[in-house]
């Protein structure tokens, strides 16, 4: 897009669906929070597509872990999400035709949740204005979201730095306890 071409064009090499697809779903979530869907039909439509993206995580990971066949993935979309069979079949074929890496379908929701969590940490606490947050995110470009968080925090990264996926409050503490 315009911002990444203007500010950090070299970062296109590090493009990640967690940023690109996550950014799109993040906006859907923000529009929901701002009351954009006014009618019951609008609300149902937005919830349907959010459920669809959650289902992508389940069927994609299940398929790649060998616990679901493509046919079971189609059945899952028909029975749980209420897709028409032809639409579910096309979605599964599109997901597994070799054009997308295994975690691509999970990137929509997981990327959105990462951006949402970063927004909670920076905007909801008053540390950053919402417009500044969005502008800064776009200026940094499509790099891993945890890298953007470290840039915003002006954190110096060591050569052995490990990212932390912060998309659920308290997850870092519960993961640390298990180690």
Predicted regions and their residues:
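N-terminal maturation segment of proteins
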Residues: 1-179
